[in-house]
Structure formats: C-alpha cells, structure tokens
Amino acid sequence: IRLSLVGSEMCIRDSGGSGLRAAIEVAEHGIDVLAVGKRPRQDAHTSLAAGGINAALGTMDEGDSWQQHAADTIKESYLLANPHTVEIVTQGAERGIRDLERWGMDFAREDDGRISQRFFGAHTFRRTAFAGDYTGLEIQRTLVAKAEQLEVPILDQVYITRLLVRDNVVFGAYGFDQSDGTRYLIHADAVILAAGGHNRIWRRTSSRRDENTGDSFRLAVEAGARLRDPELVQFHPSGIIEPENAAGTLISEAARGEGGILRNALGERFMSKYDPERMELSTRDRVALAAYTEIAEGRGTENGGVWLDVSHLPRETIMTRLPRVYQTMMELQMLDITTDPVSYTHLRAHETKAN
C-alpha cells in the first residue's frame, strides 16, 4: 500500500464549483491551499447544473436589486430562510458573476454586449444569467482554468474517509485514490467542506447514481460538527421518467423559463389551478406539488408523469437556448422536443448550505 504525505495551510474538499471558488479566493490571498475531489475536476457535479445562476445585475430590468432578490428569496422560502445568509448570498451574487466574467466565462449576451438574463421561478425580475442550458459546465470549466492559472494543486478521484481531529481541532484529512489505491495523509491548518448533499437516499434525483451520498455530512458529524436543517431538500419539478437507468435526469428549469408549458394527460395546462399568475414560472416546490397532485389524482401520463411541451417555441430558440435538453432527449429517448412533449415527474434536487 502506497502512502502519500501531503502538507498545506488549507485543505478544501471538494473540487466542484463551491470548492474551487473557495480555493481561488484563498489562493488569491496568498494562502497555500489544496483542493481534493472524488471525481476528475472537469467532471465535478457542478457540470450537471443547467439553467443558470442568479444575481440582480439589472442588465434586462433596471429596477432589480439585491434587496429585491433577497425579498423574493425570503418570501418564497415561507420565511424559513436565514435572513443573514440570504443577505450575504444576494448581495455577493453580482460579484460572483463579475468574477466569472472576468475569468473568461462565456455568458449568453444581448446584441449590445450585456449579459443576458431570463426569468426563473418566483423572480420578480429577470435575473438568471446563463450559458445556453449548460451553465454549470461552463462555470466548472472557468473555475478549473482559473485554479490552474493560480497553480492550485488539485487531487482528483481522492475519496476522503475521515477528518483528522485532536482536542476538538481539525488538523487534516485521510483518504485514498479511487483509481490506484494510494493512501493520502493530508496535514492542514484548516479544512473546508464544500461538497454535495445526501440526495441519493431517494430513488430518483437529479444527482448521479454514485454522488451526493452524504459523505460530507458524515465527515462533519464525526469531526464534532452539528448539522442544521438536513431535512430541507429541494424537490425539483422536472426529471425524466424513462429509461429507468436514466430516471431523474434533469430537464432544466430553463425549459420553463423560455416558455415551456406543463400539461396533464387530459391536455390541460394545469398550473392555472395552482398559481394562475405565475403559471409555469411559479416556485419549484409549488410546481413539483402541482405535478404530484395531478398524477396522484389520476391525471398523469401512462408512465406516471406529466407533459412538458416546448414544441411551440421556434426551433432556433430551442437549439440555441436549450441545446442540452434537446441533446439529452434525443440520446435517451430519440425524442425531438421541437415537435414532441417530454413526459417527466418531480424529483429530489439539492440542498442549500451555508457556513
């Protein structure tokens, strides 16, 4: 058994969007940092995020502001969101977008060069910046390139099995390389956990089958941390049902943001019963509950879903704004979404965590 000893001022687990963003921030402050991910850095789970990233840039609607973004967030959380956390996230969101732009991210833009933004659920204004419907992939590419420019060392495919703790102080981590079995003993002055959640306790989720298994939660608890609100998992309204080996594959919210329509098996546009003002652009929880209700009351499709229809949109819109949805449905079901609707159901998506 090979053992590799590694030392760093700070160790960050994982190498997805949040992990690499933290590593970049730390490195730019002159601190020695090591990022450790259990997948190849280009293939972190962030790359599966599709529809966009939210910030009150005001590029499309001048009346938007971080305060309005915060108000929308708190209201649609049923007042469960921590106001301090919401303030930090919404106030800092524009900086996050501008950093990505400065580092070379290829955002969709208007003809005059402004970053384009579209509506997502529960937004008062258009505030979702995007790159087609593969935004997460572009974010990950940008962050990997920036981290490599800063010469941040990244250990790929290393699974951290425990944090090292002495007298209630974390001083490193232990793990192994999943490809060749090499053991890693990492000494660090501080460890940041920036990994995924525990969605795989459900059968159908937007996560990969081998990810979001809750190991970051376990690492934290075994090191003496307390978990807060682990039950607050978001149910995303749209994931495909078939084939079974791909059940849960995400159909981006961008499909509804661009004008997609939800119908039950009777052909009824059912969101008019649940949120007649916002319709398909209601909050994810309301859309998911509406779809569940339609299915439970016998108005679902034969395979237990509802229909998402974008076939009324111009083909050019679909091919430029929803290319990943188009490609996914062609590959998995040989379904042309420019002419046919998609049958889907609600699924478990992700948690929002804050340190």
Segments (PLM) and residue ranges:
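Residue-level detector of alpha-helix initiation sites
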Residues: 16-17, 40, 134, 232
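Flavin (primarily FAD) binding-site architecture
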Residues: 198-204
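An anion/pyrophosphate-binding glycine-rich loop and adjacent beta-alpha core
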Residues: 219, 225-342
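Glycine-rich FAD pyrophosphate-binding loop
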Residues: 29-47
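N-terminal Rossmann-like FAD-binding beta1-loop-alpha1 element of flavoenzymes
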Residues: 13-34
